[in-house]
From Swiss-Prot:
Belongs to the UPF0201 family. Disulfide bonds: none annotated. It comes from the Archaea. Pfam families: RNA_binding (PF01877). This is UPF0201 protein Pisl_1658. It comes from Pyrobaculum islandicum (strain DSM 4184 / JCM 9189 / GEO3).
Length: 143
């Protein structure tokens, strides 16, 4: 599995705070910076599920598995790729809030692109189905 997280640091933002927001939900192995029209793009990458443990823990801690599953499943773009976004400001304080519309996050979201051999297993691991508030089936970590 390969994960890429992209977040924009606008000219009006503090780079350190944006990095903190990213690192509150993602543990990257490498970070690159690329210039953009309104600031700098931070592109963070990682191989394997462990870099998403913070995101998964936050989803479980907040008890939003079903909502997360609903939003993330709408981001399935192929049999091996999922794209979803979380609010950068919420991530800064350790909270997961999914972004479903382009303008929903005024300072821009953190956008994740996940490439995996088994999209369903990834979804079942990150945000499993629940029944009456309890996890129905917890899948093993994906490839």
């Amino acid at each position: 599995m390969r994960i890429e997280a992209v977040v924009e640091v606008r000219f009006t933002e503090d780079r350190g705070k944006v990095l903190k927001a990213l690192q509150n939900v993602f543990t990257p192995v490498s970070i690159e910076e690329k210039p953009s029209e309104s600031g700098v793009l931070i592109v963070a990458t990682c191989e394997g599920y462990t870099c998403l443990e913070k995101l998964r823990s936050a989803i479980w801690r907040q008890g939003i598995q079903d909502a997360a599953r609903n939003v993330i499943s709408k981001g399935i773009v192929s049999e091996n790729t999922i794209i979803f976004s979380v609010n950068k400001q919420a991530a800064y304080v350790g909270v997961v809030s999914f972004v479903t519309e382009t303008n929903e996050s005024p300072l821009g979201p953190i956008t994740f692109t996940v490439k995996t051999n088994n999209v369903r297993q990834f979804l079942d691991w990150l945000a499993p189905r629940t029944y009456r508030g309890r996890v129905y089936y917890e899948a093993p970590p994906p490839d």
